[in-house]
């Protein structure tokens, strides 16, 4: 078989001439510069040098509004349309006093804080709201009683958000991320697995299923559900697609079934989102990295993250392939 490789020099001395070359010789550069592509077969090789220019595909981003939380780090957020037709947002907190803040964001130029929920936790890392806009779930880490788990909140009226249940069975190691999909909460347990909790009666949550990799030293950071498929991000073990109700593999919330997976060398897989391209019929999962090459600064200065967005073609579930990646400026 042919063996393909490349080398290059970037236009900017501050950037490394990186890129990607596939087994069929398709090449894409991450930064502009001069690159040499080499194809080798046996004792012979051919090479071609080419100039790669930036596409300059840019768009200005305009700040419309700013909801200030000055005394604690904000962790995550979720925006939804309330049952009254107005737009709302809930934000979590990191390393604070276990607070979640609720906002009216109907006018993006004027974000209005409308309520606060405080729970026993140091960090409310993740916040999600059900599709019907009635139920919110927040995660807990660092609880004084070490039970952690999650908290279920009635947000039918976000101005009077009310806790209606807590759940910590099997989740005492801390819940870092959660997701709500069709009367079920998917909650990460201590970075090892996700438990699936039925909330058809949100006042009486009950566990109905779980999914955990059968791999040495496995861990998980996030899970996202769409069309009955759970997309989990598992650091070194990459992205896993699991049937939790879609039907393609016979999975249900109480009996999740793996569909496909893909891992990449860095092992930084932190989040994943599905995308179907209607024009081409291709199905992709965009996998995001989490990396802090200069360390994590939480006290006296900014933290500069790094890493890539990986575009993985899952059209052929048996042969997923990474087709491109984008380096996040850092």
What annotation goes with each model-predicted range?
Residues 1-57:
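Extracytoplasmic soluble-region selector
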Residues 33-34, 47-330:
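Feature marking well-ordered beta-strand scaffolds used for ligand recognition
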């Amino acid at each position: 078989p042919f063996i393909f490789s490349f080398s290059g020099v970037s236009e900017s001395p501050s950037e490394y001439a990186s890129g990607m070359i596939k087994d069929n010789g398709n090449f894409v550069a991450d930064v502009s510069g001069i690159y040499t592509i080499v194809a080798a077969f046996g004792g012979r090789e051919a090479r071609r040098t080419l100039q790669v220019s930036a596409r300059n595909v840019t768009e200005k981003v305009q700040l419309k509004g700013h909801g200030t939380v000055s005394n604690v780090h904000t962790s995550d957020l979720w925006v939804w349309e309330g049952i009254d037709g107005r737009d709302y947002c809930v934000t979590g907190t990191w390393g604070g006093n276990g607070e979640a803040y609720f906002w009216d964001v109907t006018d993006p130029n004027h974000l209005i804080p409308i309520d606060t929920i405080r729970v026993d936790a140091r960090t409310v890392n993740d916040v999600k709201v059900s599709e019907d806009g009635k139920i919110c779930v927040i995660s807990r880490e660092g609880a004084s009683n070490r039970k952690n788990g999650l908290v279920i909140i009635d947000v039918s009226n976000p101005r009077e958000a009310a806790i209606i249940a807590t759940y910590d069975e099997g989740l005492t190691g801390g819940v870092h991320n959660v997701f709500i999909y069709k009367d079920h909460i998917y909650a990460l347990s201590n970075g090892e697995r996700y438990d699936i909790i039925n909330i058809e009666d949100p006042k009486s949550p009950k566990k109905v299923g779980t999914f955990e990799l059968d791999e040495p030293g496995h861990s998980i950071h996030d899970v996202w559900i769409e069309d009955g498929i759970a997309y989990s991000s598992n650091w070194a073990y990459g992205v896993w697609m699991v049937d939790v109700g879609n039907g393609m593999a016979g999975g249900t919330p109480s009996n999740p079934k793996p569909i496909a997976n893909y891992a990449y060398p860095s092992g930084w897989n932190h989040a994943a989102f599905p995308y179907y391209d209607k024009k081409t019929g291709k199905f992709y999962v965009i996998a995001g990295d989490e990396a802090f090459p200069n360390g994590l600064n939480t006290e006296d200065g900014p933290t500069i993250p790094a890493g890539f967005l990986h575009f993985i073609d899952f059209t052929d579930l048996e042969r997923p392939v990474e087709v491109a990646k984008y380096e996040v400026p850092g």
